[in-house]
C-alpha cells in the first residue's frame, strides 16, 4: 500500500494519481478481460452498423428510429468510455490514472449511461402514444418533436453529470488515492473525501433517483397504460400485433435495467467479495450495448429489410 500511495500527500487537496483496483490478485482475470474485449468489439460493430443503416436509408428517418439512432450512439459512447481504459490497465499492467483523466472518465461513463436511461424512457413515450393514441400519433410525434426532445435530453444530461463532476473537484480527497472499482466511480471517489460535503451527498441521491428509480417507474407506468389499452382490443390478433410493436423496446428495457438492478441487489444482499462485485457490475454496464443492436436487427422488419437489400445489391455486384 505504501507504493500505491507514493504520489499521495495529505497536504494537497487531491492526489496527482489514483490507483484503480480493478480485478487485482485473481488468476482468471485475463480470461475475463478477453471476454470483455470480445463484447466491446461486438458492441461497437453492431451499434455502428445500426447507425449507418439508419443514417443512409431514408425510409428509417422516422421518430422511432431517431430514438434507436440516439441509443446506438449512447451505447458506443458508454462502451468506449469504460472498456478501453480497463483494457489499458490490463495490457500495460498500469492501474494508475491521473486526477484529470479520472474526472473525465467519471463524466463520460455516467454521461453515456445516463443517456441510455433517458433514451429508453423517451422510446417508451413513443410506444405509449403509438398504442394508446394511434390516430393522433403522427400529430403528436414527428421528426421535429423527437429531434428537439433528444437534443434537450443530451443537453440536460450533460448539465447534471457536469455539475456532479464539478462538485467532486471541491472535495479534499485526502484519505487515500485507492479507488475500489473498475473505473473512476463517483461513490468510491466520494469515500476518499476528508471533508463531508453535504451538497455532494444530496446531489448523489438526486442523481440516483433521476437516473435509476425515476426511469424504471416511468417505464413501468408506460407499460401499465399500454396493457390497459391492449385490454380494450377485442381480437387476440389485434392485441398480438400491437404488442409486437413493443417487443423490441421491452427487450431493451429488460437487458438494461435487469442486469443493473441485479448487480446492485446481489451486492447488497449477498455481501459479494470485491472482485465478484466488480465483475457483476462491469458486466451490467457492457452487456446491454452488445445486445441492443441484435435485438433491433432480429425484431424489426424494417431494419432486416434494409440489410437484405444491401446484401442483395452486394451479391449482385459480385456476380457481375
For the regions a protein language model found, what residue spans apply to each?
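Transmembrane helical core of 7TM receptor-like proteins
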Residues: 1-320
Amino acid at each position: 500500500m505504501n507504493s500505491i500511495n507514493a504520489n499521495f500527500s495529505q497536504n494537497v487537496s487531491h492526489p496527482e494519481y489514483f490507483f484503480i483496483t480493478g480485478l487485482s490478485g485473481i488468476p482468471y482475470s485475463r480470461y475475463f478481460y478477453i471476454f470483455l474485449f470480445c463484447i466491446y468489439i461486438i458492441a461497437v460493430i453492431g451499434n455502428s452498423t445500426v447507425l449507418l443503416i439508419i443514417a443512409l436509408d431514408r425510409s428509417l428517418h422516422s421518430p422511432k428510429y431517431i430514438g434507436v439512432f440516439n441509443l446506438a450512439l449512447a451505447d458506443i459512447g458508454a462502451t468506449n468510455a469504460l472498456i478501453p481504459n480497463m483494457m489499458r490497465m490490463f495490457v500495460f499492467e498500469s492501474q494508475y490514472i491521473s486526477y484529470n483523466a479520472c474526472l473525465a472518465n467519471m463524466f463520460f461513463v455516467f454521461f453515456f449511461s445516463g443517456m441510455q436511461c433517458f433514451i429508453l424512457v423517451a422510446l417508451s413515450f413513443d410506444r405509449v402514444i403509438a398504442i394508446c393514441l394511434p390516430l393522433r400519433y403522427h400529430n403528436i410525434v414527428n421528426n421535429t418533436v423527437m429531434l428537439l426532445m433528444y437534443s434537450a435530453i443530451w443537453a440536460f444530461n450533460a448539465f447534471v453529470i457536469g455539475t456532479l463532476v464539478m462538485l467532486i473537484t471541491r472535495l479534499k480527497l485526502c484519505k487515500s488515492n485507492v479507488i475500489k472499482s473498475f473505473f473512476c466511480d463517483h461513490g468510491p471517489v466520494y469515500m476518499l473525501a476528508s471533508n463531508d460535503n453535504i451538497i455532494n451527498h444530496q446531489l448523489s441521491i438526486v442523481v440516483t433517483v433521476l437516473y435509476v428509480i425515476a426511469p424504471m417507474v416511468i417505464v413501468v407506468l408506460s407499460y401499465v397504460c399500454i396493457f390497459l389499452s391492449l385490454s380494450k382490443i377485442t381480437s387476440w390478433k389485434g392485441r398480438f400485433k400491437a404488442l409486437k410493436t413493443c417487443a423490441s423496446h421491452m427487450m431493451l428495457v429488460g437487458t438494461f435495467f435487469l442486469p443493473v438492478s441485479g448487480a446492485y441487489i446481489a451486492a447488497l444482499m449477498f455481501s459479494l467479495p470485491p472482485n465478484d462485485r466488480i465483475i457483476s457490475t462491469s458486466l451490467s454496464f457492457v452487456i446491454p450495448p452488445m445486445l441492443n443492436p441484435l435485438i433491433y436487427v432480429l425484431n424489426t422488419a424494417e431494419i432486416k429489410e434494409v440489410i437484405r437489400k444491401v446484401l442483395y445489391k452486394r451479391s449482385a455486384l459480385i456476380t457481375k
